[in-house]
Amino acid sequence: MRTYVALIFWIVSATLRAQIACPCNPQDPETLKERQCALCAEAEKQSAGTVVFFVQDSSPRKPDRWLAIPRQHSPGMHHMDQLPADVRAELWRSAIAKAKELWGENWGIAYNAEKLHSQCHVHIHVGKLIDGVEWGEFKVVDGPEQIPLPGPDGLWIHPVNGKLHVHIGEQVAETVLLR
């Protein structure tokens, strides 16, 4: 029962946090000092030529997770569809390369539903895939350039026989990754 109550509390609080507008504006560096979004502050630290960078997930409950983050950002909440197609493709490519480097072919990457974002900067969760997960409908694609836009819903991706299975419509997509 306690677990159920904690889960409900987390979902409600994440939803409320996500509905608060992000004050970060890269054109006004003073707004980044508020540190409302740690990922925006990290993006500002990266060199101008960086397209995608990685940070280890800071949650102690997710010690083996990484976040793939595009350096590019804009004022307010950032969504995947706001990234230019070339940056989005590089984000997917880089996340997949990092996942393969860490976990071989037993990896997964996830983009949670927009209403559940607790950080305003776009990011992809990179982790080891939980054994045996494969449910719901999915689209089979050949590579990162074919990954569809998630829209407001989340998605998660994993490899199967040299292709990518893209599961669309998952709200909390990162639950398929080991903590």
Give residue spans per PLM region:
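HIT superfamily nucleotide-processing domains
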Residues: 19-179
